[in-house]
Amino acid sequence: MTSAVDGLKQRFMAMSQPDADGVYRNGAAKRKARTGLAMGNLTQLWNEACEAVSFDVPATGIGLGAVGSLARGQVGPSSDLDLAVIYEPHALTDQQLNELANKLWYPIWDSGLDLDQSVRTVAQCEAVTDRDLPAAMGWLDVVPIAGDTGLIESTAVSILERWRKAARKRLPELLGSAKSRLDEFGRMAYINQPDIKEARGGLRDSVLVSALAASWLADRPHGTYDDAVERLLDVRDCIHLVAGKDTNMLLSPYQAKVAAMLGLADPTLPDGEREAKSIDDLQTLLARVGRQIAFSLDSTASRAEHSLTHDKPRFAFFQVFQPRGGGKRQAPTFDVIAPGVAKHEEEIVLAPGAEPAADSNLVLRVAVAAAEYGLPIAPGTLRNLKKCPIGDRNWTDESRELFIRLLASGPALLNVWEDIDFIDVPGKLIPEWLGVRNRPSASAAHRYTIDRHMVEVVTRLGRETPSGGRYDDRHYEALLLAGILHDIG
């Protein structure tokens, strides 16, 4: 017996094909079209299921909702469907619920589509999102498909309200989940075969940005951030098309074909050279969008944490009647730790009076402070440091000393280097760095890109010699410089 979802998987693939020249274009429009097709077919499937069961399905008290990428309008060519039947207690018996669910799920499975399904009461939906952070992230975007759409909408509102009330307590858990994923999957910008969903700067981070914005603790970024997310979704779509399945792993066998679909293959180059360069360009694209998404998460999280530190009424209107300290706002305190550099609320910031545009070494002093104190650079500070007049021909005794101190900071160097690389500092100090930046390694044994490999090497260089002695200052400086430059040229 045919169903509304028969052939849906094939239609997803057919409507997702690249243009005649092999380039995948208009990704956002294609995602919208796939989502619309899925929602329409699922509405029909609900009607078919209601007609096929041995009882009358009530018009109220039960409905079908979309969760995850389907709810966000981000369906890929091979994405699974994340669906939930939501019902009120006593709307149907357990036996009736099971019969209705089978009439929904089996046609989807038979069509070849992957399915993540659940059947829950409103209270169970709320309970799951209260205790399960990954589930909460997906359920913040619940949208109705069919049945009692009002019930689905009210459930979505309830989940969102509960998230906002609990967000202050759950913020550390949310940020901790991002740290755990970073430890497990690494940074997308530096991985030769990244998981573009779970790696730092991947699609999962964009979901966290939306969750932080939904909490009302911080506004979400727009503009270049939205462009980065859409471009990464284009990459995901191309992976689906090349792999022919639902995967977020950009494996080596896929990379040249994905790069070509993204329009990165230069037709004027010989085949071998064209393929190698397109893979390099693909890695550069991933690094750019991944850094933008990661920076957006960091800056949104920083604003959210700041709002927790400065808990005050949401609207200034109320402050008229509840003035603080005699109506005067307390001035922020800065612990100045280097010229132009200060600690403020567990972040490294610019000290009052600092002038980035007139201080070429300020960015290195900030980087050294962040590494040696083990504190992050405030996102606003990082943006201001773009004004520093950095060059490769104006090295001074101070800049050389600061650079060596930064290289000698051990594992703390990794995050700090990523921060300053986001604003192109290494390439301005060492132009040759741009030749290896974001480039994948030719060796399958290497997990990281060439630039990340060199930074990793430096973090492991201590003062102890292979024979058990200790390097003096001059030899240790030479070792650190050799480490950060050893693959250049």
Q: Positions of the model-derived regions?
A:
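A cross-family structural signal marking well-folded subdomains
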Residues: 240, 307-427, 439
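Extended, Lys/Arg-enriched charged tracts that mediate electrostatic binding to polyanionic substrates
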Residues: 39-64, 94, 294-343
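Active-site nucleotide-donor binding segment shared across nucleotidyl transfer reactions
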Residues: 25, 29-30, 39-94, 98
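Divalent metal-dependent catalytic cores for phosphoryl transfer on phosphate-bearing substrates
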Residues: 74-81, 85-99, 244, 260, ...
